[in-house]
Amino acid sequence: LTSIGPLLPTLRQATGLSFGGAALLTALPVLMMGLMALAGGAINRLFSERSAVALSLLAIGLGALWRELAPGSVQLLMSAVLGGLGIGVIQAVMPGIIKHHFLNSMALVAGLWSAALMGGGGLGAAITPWLMSIGHDWHSALAWWALPALVALLAWWPVSRGLSRLSAVGENRGPSLLRNRRAWLLGAYFGLINGGYTTK
């Protein structure tokens, strides 16, 4: 997600991407993340924890790899949709995984997860220009980010055997989040954070 920003001038020059297209390139992943957050309940019912994380990592990896083969702006935009879909799914299911498997250390693990998200975003913005500076073209500099996603997928699949369905955790759903004041406050808080983060 953050690897695109530093290369936008190069991308626009190489692909003829308009200013509107450049805005879409950064907005589409965020839109997909929001849609997947709304679909979190359905995702949790349809997929096991193991499958949901694996599919999300696969989508992120393929989205990044697609950029190696993207000759123009349309394919670049589609890769952004696929990557955003993967990020959105993993962000929708990870809180349930943390709650289910790390109940006694939930705050620590959730903090580590949040730090990893922010740190990974910073690395994407910092390392991608460096990859271009050592001789890679923009295609390759962006496609390199398929590697950590696919490594994570290969690591996740064997260690996650036996994980149960997320829906088993959430059978007692309690009151609707739409009537929960704290849920609205948290939504506004994280929305403002992500809004500021993605408009820099």
Predicted regions and their residues:
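Conserved MFS/SLC helix-loop-helix module at the cytosolic interface between two early adjacent transmembrane helices
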Residues: 35-74
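Cytoplasmic helix-loop-helix junction between adjacent transmembrane helices
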Residues: 79-115
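Helix-loop-helix hairpin linking two adjacent transmembrane segments in secondary transporters
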Residues: 104-108, 112-164
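Juxtamembrane intracellular "pre-TM" segments in multi-pass secondary transporters
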Residues: 161-186
